[in-house]
């Protein structure tokens, strides 16, 4: 099976574009593929406590349900771009979280570069 890296850029301001990367990840996982998700730009706003449960795109599953499937049922890693989170006030300059993240871990650009090299497919949303 394949190894996929999904890069998400959209946050709760656009529920459709925020949800589709996670829906795609779920479909890939259900087919037996290995999936990691990297959150860039406003997508970092999806992981603080209380956000995902309120992201509902018309006709799509609730974002929180997708995140739970990916992180609890299947243990797929979600990475929060540190620079993007820092620029949006979610992380201090010392790289300490300023909020409670319900899922994901902070990721540095060098990690992203490694993931891109190591994966079979990179999908950007």
Language-model regions, residue ranges each:
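Short, glycine-rich nucleotide/cofactor-binding loops
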Residues: 6-19, 51, 57
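Ligand-binding beta-strand-loop-alpha-helix segment within the catalytic cores
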Residues: 79-82, 88-103
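Histidine-anchored nucleotide/phosphate-binding helix
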Residues: 18-31, 37
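C-terminal structural segments of small proteins and small subunits
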Residues: 96-114, 118, 123
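Short internal beta-strands
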Residues: 35-41, 77-84
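Short, hinge-like loop/turn segments at secondary-structure boundaries
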Residues: 53-57, 96-99
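Extreme N-terminal starter segment of soluble prokaryotic enzymes
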Residues: 1-5
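A glycine-rich helix N-cap at a beta->alpha junction
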Residues: 54-83
């Amino acid at each position: 099976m394949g190894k996929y890296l999904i890069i998400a850029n959209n946050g709760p301001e656009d529920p459709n574009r925020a949800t589709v990367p996670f829906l795609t990840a779920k479909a890939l996982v259900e087919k037996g593929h290995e999936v990691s998700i990297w959150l860039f730009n406003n997508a970092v706003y999806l992981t603080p406590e209380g956000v995902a449960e309120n992201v509902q795109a018309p006709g799509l599953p609730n974002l929180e349900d997708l995140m739970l499937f990916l992180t609890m049922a299947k243990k797929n890693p979600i990475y929060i771009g540190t620079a993007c989170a820092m620029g949006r006030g979610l992380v201090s300059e010392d790289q300490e979280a300023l909020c409670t993240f319900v899922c994901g871990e902070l990721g540095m650009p060098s990690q992203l570069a490694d993931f891109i090299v190591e994966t079979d497919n990179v999908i950007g949303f």
